[in-house]
Amino acid sequence: MNLTVSDILEFLENVAPSSLAEKNDPIGLQVGSKKAPVKGILLTVDPSISACKFAIDQGLNLIVSHHPLFYNPMQSLTPDAYPGNVAYYAVKEGLNLIAWHTPLDKVSWGVSAALAERLGLSPESPILSETSLGEGNGLGVLVKFSKSVKLGELAKEVAKKVDSWVMMVGDENCEVDSLGICGGSCSFLMEHLKKLSVKTLLTSDVKYHTAKQAEIEGFNFLIVDHGAAESLVLPKLKEKLNQFLSKRGFQIPVVIFTEKSPYKIIQEV
């Protein structure tokens, strides 16, 4: 009996239910067939051409990415422009592409919990809880420090442990006793955290005007590379997937693929 793409979709549904997905989040099988036999699985943040070529080189025919390839209807499917070029290449090479996005953001063991774990911190609760969808599920995590730490020192620790550049909004000498963590683009959680008397958020992709507002209001941001933060969930997903495969009696390779950040730090002020 062959392992199929449908079996992997069932696995994902069990470990990070689709009911956790944000409205209009295009999760699931985006390219390929549910009936296709699975020879090997690639886990990655983004379904890129590089990821596809690596999968082919490794003999893997299923890619499970965090980010979807398609968010909006495509206007063309050609080898010349993204994202159509990825779909074109995947179909040509017989690859199957699954995206499993916000369920991995919200599940209790997911993206933000993995980021906290990398920092050696224990989450107390989600920032935005969705207990109706399971205990501990929700967006982001809250952590408290037994002893306060200066924001600047915390930024240096984050840079070292996450292996990412870090931008900081706030006074580096500010004492931090609690922290919101949300892998991905979560600056919108600032207002919610302020209501919880938490004045620092570790996240990605903070816009200028949001940063300016935070600076004026005394709220702190630690901003890290989006891909670096979200890639930390992949080893946890791999572990769960290997357990699933072992119980089913399959010996299928599961490989993590990471790409360099598109951002390059040229000069520090």
Region spans (language model):
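Active-site catalytic microenvironments in core metabolic enzymes, especially phosphate/sugar-handling
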Residues: 1-269
